[in-house]
Amino acid sequence: MRNMKAIFIKQIRSMIKNPLLIGQGIMFIIMIVVMTFLMSPDRECDVCIPAYVCETCLRENPIHSLPSPTIAGMFSVMFMGMVMIGSSSALVQEDKTTHNLRFMTMSGMKPYQYLIGTASALFLVAVSLLFFYALAGRYFGLDTLRFLLLTGSGALVSILFGIAMGLSKMPAIATPISILFGFGPMFSNFNENMARWLHFTYTQQVNLAIYHLDDGLQQRPFLIIGATGLLTLIAFVWMHRKGELRW
């Protein structure tokens, strides 16, 4: 317990000294606020379009039948998928390059202690930032809790994935994977084939669940998020036993 607490405090200090994660999170919040004001709906134009025109467009272009993304939802998924995976991996790689990880291992630290301590610190920062994402997206009351539950659980999976990639022998693979999980759901809003391919990824499930947030939380997104997190933990344990992790 003492080791996990020390790792937690150490990682919080590292993120304050090198505030890349916090800076990117704040940048996305500002973009949500700005784009919300710039992309206000044109109600007069919507009213003047005859109903038969909309039906014809849906038949000819099925992309319009996909759920319309919310601005807060898009940037939240980008932060949760791309930024959290990249930042988690970078934080672990920093510990490796500065030899802090080796010193902690020599002092008796266990792999699960490092995983829990680091993941807890990253999760605290992520949820704190996601709270302001909810406010910027105008999610209040119960919707705020639903939003945080969805994005927070997705962020936790990204953190676990990033830590595992950062400790692996190929940490560079975290970058293309984070781009896929971060930008994939955004592009899937405008491409039916991509939406079909990414349907069972945890970031896409969060993206769809945010769109239907007013209808309440469904069980399916959490099943996919939980299954992804479990597979990540299993992969972490397997890589550790096979000696694929570099401490």
Please report, for each region that a protein language model flagged, where it lies by residue.
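Aromatic- and glycine-rich beta-strand/loop motifs that create alpha-glucan
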Residues: 1-28
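Short hydrophobic, aromatic-rich alpha-helical segments embedded in or entering the lipid bilayer
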Residues: 2-6, 190-223
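Alpha-helical transmembrane segments and their short interhelical loops
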Residues: 111-112, 118-169
